[in-house]
Amino acid sequence: MEALKQGADALFILLGGIMVLAMHAGFAFLELGTVRKKNQVNALVKILVDFSVSTVVYFVVGYSVAYGTTFFVGAEQLAAKNGYDLVKFFFLLTFAAAIPAIISGGIAERAKFWPQLIATAVIVGFVYPFFEGIVWNQHFGVQAWIKAVTGDEFHDFAGSVVVHAMGGWIALPAVVLLGARYNRYHKDGQVSAHPPSSIPFLALGSWILIVGWFGFNVMSAQTLDKISGLVAVNSLMAMVGGTLAALVLGKNDPGFVHNGPLAGLVAVCAGSDLMHPFGALVVGAVAGALFVVMFTLTQNKWKIDDVLGVWPLHGICGAWGGIAAGIFGASSLGGLGGVNFTAQLMGTVLGVFWALLGGVLVYGVLKITLGLKMSQEEEYDGADLTVHKISATPDREVSW
C-alpha cells in the first residue's frame, strides 16, 4: 500500500505540474493578444525562453535556496519514492517561472531581450525562493515569530502573495524604471490608445490560465490524501465573481471581462482551502473590481505604462488575497479557521516589501549597467523585427 501511495502522490503532483506548465501558454497568448502586432512574436519567445532559464536556475540554485534540497546526487537517490522529489520540484518550478511570466506582461513592447533574461535568472534563483522558503519552509523563524505575535502563522495555500503579489510588486519598479512606451503619454496630458491586437488570442490566453489554475490551486495539496474539493469550488466561485465584477465595472470591455476571472483566481489562492464558497465569491468579486479600478488609474491618471496591468492584476489582487484569507477564512464567516487578520496582514506586507526591494535592486542595477529599454527606432520597428528579425505575419513568403 505504501508503494501505491507513493506512486499516486507522484502522479498527482506531476499532473499538477503539467497543468501549471500549460498555464505558461496562457501567459504567452494573453500577452500576444494584448500587445500590438509588431510585438507578438516577441511575446511568444519571451515566455518560452524565460521558462527555460527559470528551469535551469531553479534546478541548480533556487530550489535549494527555498527548501535546502540539492540535486547534485546520483539518479538512484533522485528516483526514490517514484521520483516524488523530482516531480515536486517540477510542480514548484512552474510556480517560480510564473514570476518572470508576470513581469513580462508589464514591460512588454519596449524592454531589451537579454537584460530581462538576466533579471529572470536573478529573480528565480534568489529573490523569489528566499521569500518562498520563509513562507513554505519555515526559514529564518519568520513564521514562528508571526505566530508568537498573532497566534497563527501566515497562511498562503497556493501563492496569492508568495507567487502573484511577488511577481506583481517586482514588476512595478521594473515598469517605472523602464519608462513608458514612446508617444504613450503626451505633454498635453493626452493618452495614446494601444488597443489589444487580438481579442481572440487574449481570450484564449485567459481560458488556458483559468483551466490550468485548478491544477495550480488544487494540486497545491501536493499529496493525494490532502486533496480538497473545497479548493476547487472556491477557485470556481472566485473566478466567476471576478468575471461578473469586471463585466459590470468594466462596462462589458472584453479585456476587462477576460482579466476579471484571473483577478479572482489570484486573490483566492491564499485562502482557497479555508473559505466558504460564498466567501470566495466575494473575494473574487472584490478582486475583479480592484483590477478594473486600479488598471484605469495606473494607465490614465498615474501614467504608469503597465501594458497588461500586471501590478493591479497580480500585485494588488495578490495582496488582497493574502489579507482576505484572514477575513473570509475565519470560522465566524463560515471558513475553517486557523487564520487571523493580523498574521495575514503581516505576511502580506513582508512579501510586498521584499518584492519591491528585489525589483528595485535587480532592475536598478540592470538599468545602470546594460540599460533596460530599446531605442526609439527599435521600439517603432517593433520587438519582432528588432529582436527576432521576423514578424508574426510576414508580408510575403520566401520563394523556394
Q: Which stretches of residues belong to each language-model region?
A:
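Hydrophobic alpha-helical transmembrane bundles of multi-pass membrane proteins
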Residues: 1-400
